[in-house]
Amino acid sequence: MQSIPIKNVGESRLVDPFQRQYYYLRLSITDQCNFRCTYCLPDGYQPEANKPSFLTLKEITHLAQAFAEMGTEKIRLTGGEPTLRKDFISIAESITNIDGIRQLAVTTNGYRMAKDVADWKQAGITSINVSVDSLDPKMFHQITGINKFDDVMRGIDRAFEVGYNKVKVNSVLMKNLNDKEFEQFLAWVKDRPIQMRFIELMQTGEMDSFFDKFHLSGQVLADKLLKNGWTLQHKSHTDGPAKVFTHSDYTGEIGLIMPYEKNFCASCNRLRVSAKGKLHLCLFGEEGIELRDLLQSHEQQGILQARIFAALQGKREHHYLHIGDTGVRNHLASIGG
């Protein structure tokens, strides 16, 4: 475990040595997932024996309060599949009630969405990202290992019914698997308020051969969009890494997440905390800085904030994916991708 010196940061905001400000926390609340996606957990979730349990509701609340006081405005609940937690609604309600948190998002596989999305809305979830890697039910099954395409589609429709104005849909771009569906995805968002986001396949320790076989640059899609009249939009300070394109003939939008692009890290605005309480400065970075020992009481909050601030001063200017350095992560489910 990396040790971090303690000092009093007072009212310091989350700013790194490169003057990037961090308004956005991606908080994993479980490693567990009920899908077996080929690019993430192809063998399914494998619980680790004798490992610490996931953060409790109380610990999550202390953590979110500390980040909010340091300037965090947006928290995204991730996993694993975050909605598998029995106290998911309680977690959402607790974070919603914290001063300074303006947006509470969730990334989900959509498995429980049709049944539960009204409760998510009531609990304060302001935006939803759903994973849909194919619009072909057979290909969806092949990629996810689960035959639940129709359920996920019903969940997206239900989200609009209960009052969400937009749903973001994530698709991991894979050569010769779903890249041929680009036109189909465009047609799908033509009259729907969906931001369809294509995420470049990312290399991790366990997936080198899979990456070599299926990686496709998102620039291929960017070139198609620009050629066909789509316009790149400006980001707000709490937006994620996607480049978002709009077109006057389309209700929906297209987002591209291209981590291998030059200067991808220049606009980084997010930090990550794992389901077991480690702070990660980068998706492709270090083993993590322990925070859980300082999540046991409100009286520890000043020391907790000092540790977070000190850790941030060691954040690198950029990742090293371009030279094959994927960090220590075997797969991305462990810190919420």
UniProtKB/Swiss-Prot annotation:
Record CDD domains: Radical_SAM (cd01335), Twitch_MoaA (cd21117)
Residues involved in GTP binding: 26, 76, 107, 168, 270-272
Binding site for [4Fe-4S] cluster 2: 265, 268, 282
Cofactor note (record): Binds 2 [4Fe-4S] clusters. Binds 1 [4Fe-4S] cluster coordinated with 3 cysteines and an exchangeable S-adenosyl-L-methionine and 1 [4Fe-4S] cluster coordinated with 3 cysteines and the GTP-derived substrate.
PROSITE patterns cross-referenced by the UniProt entry: MOAA_NIFB_PQQE, RADICAL_SAM
One of the Pfam families matching this protein, by short name: Mob_synth_C
Keyword flag S-adenosyl-L-methionine: yes
Protein name as annotated: GTP 3',8-cyclase
Chemical reaction(s) catalysed: GTP + AH2 + S-adenosyl-L-methionine = (8S)-3',8-cyclo-7,8-dihydroguanosine 5'-triphosphate + 5'-deoxyadenosine + L-methionine + A + H(+)
Swiss-Prot/TrEMBL cofactor(s): [4Fe-4S] cluster
